Design a protein with these regions (language model features):
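Ligand-binding cleft/hinge of the Venus flytrap
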Residues: 35-37, 51-60, 100, 137-154, ...
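Gram-negative bacterial Sec-dependent N-terminal signal peptides
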Residues: 1-19
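Short helix-initiation/N-cap motifs at beta->coil->alpha
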Residues: 48-49, 63-74, 116, 151-165, ...
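Extracytoplasmic small-molecule ligand-binding "clamshell" domains
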Residues: 20-87
Length: 185
């Protein structure tokens, strides 16, 4: 599978230091280490740090909102927000809807399941694998592995919980995010 690319999507935001402005960013904040919500109910992570650095550079103020992943592009198109800062693959379909910056992070994807239960994708035939709704991970499984039942989730956090509780057999997600999960489990 093509490596995952993270990108900033911009809609009508002129990134110049000529006038102080507020840039309204949206993300799906259950995606550590890129985006998550801390103990103070604040959105934090790599993408937030990058957005804040961008705002500092252009003398703007950043605000962040948490939304379902599959609502990010519609929110941008309807100008409810100014930019998306989230782990989002650049695809031809998405490029028809929004503008992307140059990618700033490459990532791969992997399956994770109960320890020692599955050692190959072939063993997931007929099994339920969680994916985040609207992602290229979902499309990849549906297109390349129709023998696997995809279970869409609004967040990878909910897929992780269902995996831990035995309601699904695996999760297919970004390597960096899954690695963060495995640190805690």
């Amino acid at each position: 599978m093509k490596k995952v690319l993270l990108a900033v999507l911009l809609a009508g935001v002129t990134l110049s230091a000529t006038a102080a402005q507020t840039i309204r960013f949206a993300t799906e904040a259950s995606y550590p280490p890129f985006e998550s919500i801390d103990a103070n109910n604040k959105i934090v992570g790599f993408d937030v740090d990058l957005a804040n650095a961008l705002c500092k550079e252009i003398d703007a103020t950043c605000t962040f909102s948490n939304q379902a992943f599959d609502s990010l592009i519609p929110s941008l198109k309807f100008r409810r927000i100014d930019a998306v800062m989230a782990g989002m693959d650049i695809t031809p379909e998405r490029e028809k809807q929004v503008l992307f910056t140059t990618p700033y992070y490459d990532n791969s994807a992997l399956f994770v399941g109960q320890q020692g239960k599955y050692t190959s994708v072939d063993q997931l035939k007929g099994k339920k694998v969680g994916v985040q709704n609207g992602t290229t991970h979902q499309k990849f499984i549906m297109d390349k592995h129709p023998e696997i039942t995809t279970v869409p989730y609004d967040s990878y956090q909910n897929a992780k919980l269902d995996l831990q509780n035995g309601r699904i057999d695996g999760v297919f997600g970004d390597t960096a995010v899954v690695t963060e999960w495995l640190k805690d489990n």
